[in-house]
């Protein structure tokens, strides 16, 4: 993280109901690449004297021409409040939760279609009806 990076916050609001502080973050980084989210979380944690693991930064967009990035930041009172209120995918991004393991799409479809097939006594009756119609 370079010292030439300036972080400003605006539209600061304390949200007691969700146990957090929320704000819009402006990052000035002229002539430099974008700041990483982890560096931003650490810097915001230092600015607001909180643990960096309770800080969430998202929605960062770099303005045309570079040098200026704007996004949102949420600073929770503690990590437990963060786990309670943050969406699961954001918790996965910062390492507070494990990603959901999904079954492959094709396997889900095959299972659905196998379940639709007639089996057992019903299968025998269906076979007899088809023979009677022939």
Swiss-Prot record:
SUPFAM superfamilies: Ribosomal proteins S24e, L23 and L15e. The gene is rps2401. It comes from Schizosaccharomyces pombe (strain 972 / ATCC 24843). It comes from the Eukaryota. This is Small ribosomal subunit protein eS24A. The keyword Ribonucleoprotein applies. Residues 100-134 are annotated as: Disordered. Component of the small ribosomal subunit (SSU). Mature yeast ribosomes consist of a small (40S) and a large (60S) subunit. The 40S small subunit contains 1 molecule of ribosomal RNA (18S rRNA) and at least 33 different proteins. The large 60S subunit contains 3 rRNA molecules (25S, 5.8S and 5S rRNA) and at least 46 different proteins. One of its GO terms (molecular function) is structural constituent of ribosome. Its main location: cytoplasm. The lineage of its organism: Eukaryota, Fungi, Dikarya, Ascomycota, Taphrinomycotina.
């Amino acid at each position: 993280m370079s010292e030439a990076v300036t972080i400003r916050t605006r539209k600061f609001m304390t949200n007691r109901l969700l146990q957090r502080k929320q704000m819009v973050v402006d990052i000035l980084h002229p002539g430099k690449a974008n700041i990483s989210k982890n560096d931003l979380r650490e810097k915001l944690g230092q600015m607001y004297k909180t643990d960096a693991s309770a800080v969430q930064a998202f929605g960062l967009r770099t303005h045309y021409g570079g040098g200026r990035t704007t996004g949102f930041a949420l600073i929770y009172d503690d990590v437990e409040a963060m786990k309670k209120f943050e969406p699961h995918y954001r918790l996965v991004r910062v390492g507070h939760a494990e990603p959901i393991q999904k079954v492959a799409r094709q396997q889900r479809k095959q299972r659905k279609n196998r379940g639709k097939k007639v089996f057992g006594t019903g299968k025998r009756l269906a076979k007899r009806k088809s023979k009677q119609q022939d």
